[in-house]
Amino acid sequence: MAASSSSTTRLIPLLLVLTFCLALASASAWAAAAGDDDLLAAAREPGMAEWLRGVRRRIHRHPELAFEEVRTSELVRAELDAIGVPYQWPVARTGVVATIAGGGGGDGPVVALRADMDALPVQELVDWEHKSQENGKMHACGHDAHTAMLLGAAKLLQKRKNELKGTVKLVFQPAEEGSAGAYYVLQEGVLDDVSAMFGMHVDPALPVGVVAARPGPFAATSGRFLATITGKGGHAAFPHDAIDPVVAASNAILSLQQIVAREIDPLQGAVVSITFVKGGEAYNVIPQSVEFGGTMRSMTDEGLAYLMKRIKEIVEGQAAVNRCGGGVDFMEESMRPYPAVVNDEGMYAHARASAERLLGAGGVRVAPQLMGAEDFGFYAARMPSAFFTIGVGNATTSSARAAHTTHSPHFVIDEAALPVGAAVHAAVAIDYLSKHASSM
C-alpha cells in the first residue's frame, strides 16, 4: 500500500502537466480555427465584398495584354497605397511586388502569394454592365479576379500585421499568358528570400466555396514550335520540275501524330497538336516553302525534352526524304517553354489543411492533372510551392460549362468567389508563418 501511494503521488505532477499541455493544444487549435473563421467572415463583410467586386470590375473593363498592364498596375499600386502596404515597382516591366512584414520587423520566414494580371486577345461576348471596353481584349481567364483576390488578401493581412510571424510578399505578376512573366519576375531577384510560394487559378467547373489541388505534377509543361520545310516552287502542272514542300509537310504532320500514339507510355500524359499550316496562295503554284506549328505538352520536363527532340528529328527526316530542307524553331527565348507545375508534397499538405480549416473538409477536393500550362511552374521549380484552383461556378455557369470555359468569349464568374479567394490566400500565408517561425 505504501508503495502504491508513493507511485500515485509521483504521478500527480505528470498528470497535471499532461492536462495542461492538452488544454494548451486544444486552445491553440481553437484559436487557429477561430482565426480562419474570422478571416472568411471579414472577407465576406458587405463593405469588403463590395470593394472586391468593384476592384475586379474596374480591371475587367480595361483588360491589358502581356507586359502592357500599365493601367492595371496603376490600380494595384493605388489600392496598396490606400491599404498602407509598401511595394516594389516596376518588376518585370509592369509587375508589382508588395511586402507585409510582421510585428517582428521582418524577422522570421518569408512566404509569397501570387496573382497574374494580364488578359487575352479575345473579343468579349458577355453582355453585362462591366463588359470589356477594349476592343479585342478580354479577361477571359480570370486574372482580374486573381488580382482582386490578392488585393483582398493584402487588406486582411495588413489588419493582422502585428500577429504575423514573418513576412508576406504579394506578387502581382505580368504576362502569364504565353510570355513567361514569372521567369522575368524571378530574374529580378525580388523573391530570392522567399522560402515558399502559393498561387491559385479560377475554375468555372468548381462551385464557389471549393478549392482543388493535388500533390506532385499538377499542370503540364508546354512549349511551341514553328517548322519550316523548303522545297522548290514551280507550276502545279509540272510537279516534276518542282520539289513539293506540301507533300513533305503533310508527311511530317502525320508522322508527328505517332509520337504520342506509339512512343509515349499511355499512362503518361503528352500532347502534340498542330494548330496551323501556311503554304502557297495560288491554285496552280507549288509553293517554295510551307510552315506549320503548334504546341507540345507533357506532365514532366523530361517528357517535354523528348517531344522536342522527336519533333526536330521527324521534321528534318521527312524533309530530307522528300528532297527538301527542314528546320524547327522552338522559340525558347521569345516564347519560353513553361516548366510543369509540380506541387511540393509538404506545401500541398499545408495549403490543403489551411483551406479545410477555412472551408470545411467538403470545400477541398483532389484535382485531376491538367494539360493546360501555367508559368507558376517557374516558381515551383525554384522553391517549395503549391498551386490550386478555386471555384467560381454556380448552378447557372456550371450547367453551361462548355460555353464558359476559360479563354472563351462567354467566360463568366460568380463574384461570390472573390472573398473566398482573399481569405484562402491570407489563411495559407498566416498558417505558414506560424508553423515555420519556430524553425528560424
From Swiss-Prot:
Swiss-Prot/TrEMBL keywords: Hydrolase, Signal
Name of this chain's protein: IAA-amino acid hydrolase ILR1-like 9
For biological process, the GO terms are: auxin metabolic process
UniProt xrefs under Gene3D superfamilies: 3.30.70.360, Zn peptidases
Q: Tell me the name of the encoding gene.
A: ILL9
Query: What molecular functions are annotated in GO for this chain?
Result: IAA-Ala conjugate hydrolase activity
Q: What does this protein do?
A: Hydrolyzes certain amino acid conjugates of the plant growth regulator indole-3-acetic acid (IAA).
Signal peptide bounds: 1-27
EC nos: 3.5.1.-
Its taxonomic path starts at: Eukaryota, Viridiplantae, Streptophyta, Embryophyta, Tracheophyta
